[in-house]
Structures are given as C-alpha cells and as structure tokens.
C-alpha cells in the first residue's frame, strides 16, 4: 500500500525511522528537564521488562542446563582471541564518545560523591547486567528456535500475542530513545552551542546533530555488522582514545586535579 521502498528498506521502515528521529528532536527541544525525566523512568522500566524476557527465556529453554551445555563455536583459544580483542576494542569505541563527554551529565550531580558513585558503581553494574541478560536471551533462542536471535525486533516477531508484541516494541522504543539521546545527541548539541554561543543554542545544536546523523546514513553502517564493529567502531576508537589520553594527562599530571572554575565557563 505504501510502495516498495528504496535504498534497501521498505517505506514503513523509513517512516518509522523519521518518526523516531522526530521524537528525539522533540525531546531535545523540550530541554534537559524532560530528558532527565525520561532517563529516570526509562532505565528501571527497561530493566524490569528485560528481566521478564529473561524469565521467559529460562522457562522456554527448560532452565540453565541446555544453555550451559552449548559447545563453543571456537576451535581453540587462538581463534577466540582473534574475535574477542577487536570486539572488546569495538565496545571501548562504542562507549568512548560518552566517556569523553561525561561532564555533560555529571555537572548536574550535587556532590563529587554522587558523580563518583554513578560512574564507578551504577553505570558499570547496569551495563554488565544488561549485557549478561542479552547474552542469556540470545543463547536461549538457540535452544528454543534452533538459531541465535540477537535482534530484539526479530525475536518479538516470533511472539503470537498482540499485547506482548505491543509491550515489547514499546520497551524497545523506550530503551533506544533513552540511550540515543543521552549518548549521541546531548554532547554534540552542547559542543555546537559552546562553540558558537551567539548563534547556536542547545536546541539548535540538537537539530544540527539530528541532521548530521541523517547525512551520515547510519543504515549503511548497520547493513554490515562486521564492518560496523571491526571497521567503524575499532577505527574511530583509536582517535577518541588519543583525545581521552590528552584529557587524562592534562587533569592528573599537568593541572594536578586543580581547575580554575572561571576558565571552564569562558567562551
């Protein structure tokens, strides 16, 4: 009814992409207060729903036994390390952008203790739990459906209940929305606003970021998972690692952890 689509994607997929893009921009235009509200309730909601999915996977796969009995796909440690090391580097690159711009969020902390706990305890713990649940669910799909399903959209398509599908898709939207805005929009929006404060506001910076995001054609990156991980993520992690090294050396060695607060706000 909507045509055959273009660039390898259906018309409905393009409409979904544009609607989601517009939702991101709308939240940014409402400011940091709405963003903070979204982040505060999105994380526990997604955690609860993912835990429910883990419970389903555990029951459908008849417990942990079949999951732990699965054999490794690697013949030896040499083949394992060839995949593990670049994959680990890719994940470091994935989080490098947020780590460099963490002050965009920690500045709202009411004390050093709050931001320290958030970065050293809360963030690593929640990411480990989410990653572990993702591995568990994907492993369970191998037992349940005979093949690993890592894409939550494809997994949801296996369900029969319209209610379950609706709740699951809403959870996917909330999870993607909260992560995308916090990790990919806030920091560059602040960068544009701070670079040209007379001409660009935070809202305008968010709009510029959204336009650049479309021009980068992210659907091409995701079309090839191997290229996305081993070329894109591993490639730019080297550049961001260098920037991170400069920031660490400047703060700990050059400035001895002492900053002039007035200099931080000069434009």
How would you name each of these model-derived features?
Residues 133-180, 198-199, 215-225, 231-238:
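TM-loop-TM module centered on a large, flexible mid-protein loop between adjacent transmembrane helices
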Residues 16-23, 55-61, 72-137, 162-182:
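Hydrophobic, membrane-embedded alpha-helices of multi-pass small-molecule transporters
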Residues 2-29, 44-53, 87-102, 166-171, ...:
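Transmembrane alpha-helical segments of multi-pass small-molecule transport proteins
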Residues 45-72, 94, 134-143, 245-257:
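Hydrophobic alpha-helical segments and their helix-loop junctions in multi-pass secondary transporters
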Residues 1-18, 25, 29-32, 60-85, ...:
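Inter-helical loop and helix-membrane interface segments of multi-pass membrane transporters/permeases
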Residues 15-59, 69, 119-123, 233-241:
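Membrane-interface loop-to-helix entry segments
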Residues 19-42, 101-111, 187-196, 217-229:
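Membrane-water interface regions at transmembrane-helix termini and the short interhelical loops
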Residues 1-12, 107, 124, 181-209, ...:
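Helix-loop-helix connectors at the membrane interface of multi-pass transporters/channels
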């Amino acid at each position: 009814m909507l045509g055959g689509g273009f660039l390898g994607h259906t018309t409905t997929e393009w409409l979904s992409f544009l609607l989601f893009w517009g939702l991101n921009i709308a939240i940014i235009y409402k400011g940091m207060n709405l963003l903070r509200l979204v982040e505060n309730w999105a994380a526990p909601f997604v955690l609860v729903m993912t835990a429910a999915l883990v419970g389903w996977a555990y029951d459908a796969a008849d417990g942990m036994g079949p999951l732990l009995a699965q054999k490794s796909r690697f013949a030896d440690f040499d083949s394992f390390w060839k995949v593990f090391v670049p994959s680990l580097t890719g994940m470091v690159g994935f989080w490098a952008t947020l780590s460099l711009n963490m002050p965009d969020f920690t500045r709202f902390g009411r004390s050093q203790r709050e931001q320290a706990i958030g970065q050293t305890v809360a963030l690593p713990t929640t990411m480990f739990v989410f990653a572990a649940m993702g591995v568990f669910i994907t492993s369970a799909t191998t037992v349940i459906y005979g093949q690993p399903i890592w894409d939550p959209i494809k997994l949801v398509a296996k369900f029969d209940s319209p209610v379950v599908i609706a709740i699951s898709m809403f959870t996917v939207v909330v999870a993607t929305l909260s992560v995308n805005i916090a990790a990919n929009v806030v920091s560059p929006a602040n960068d544009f606003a701070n670079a040209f404060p007379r001409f660009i506001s935070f809202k305008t910076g968010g709009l510029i970021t959204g336009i650049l995001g479309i021009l980068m054609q992210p659907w091409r990156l995701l079309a090839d998972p191997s290229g996305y991980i081993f070329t894109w993520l591993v490639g730019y992690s080297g550049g961001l690692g260098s920037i991170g090294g400069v920031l660490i050396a400047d703060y700990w060695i050059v400035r001895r952890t002492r900053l002039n607060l007035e200099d931080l706000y000069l434009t």
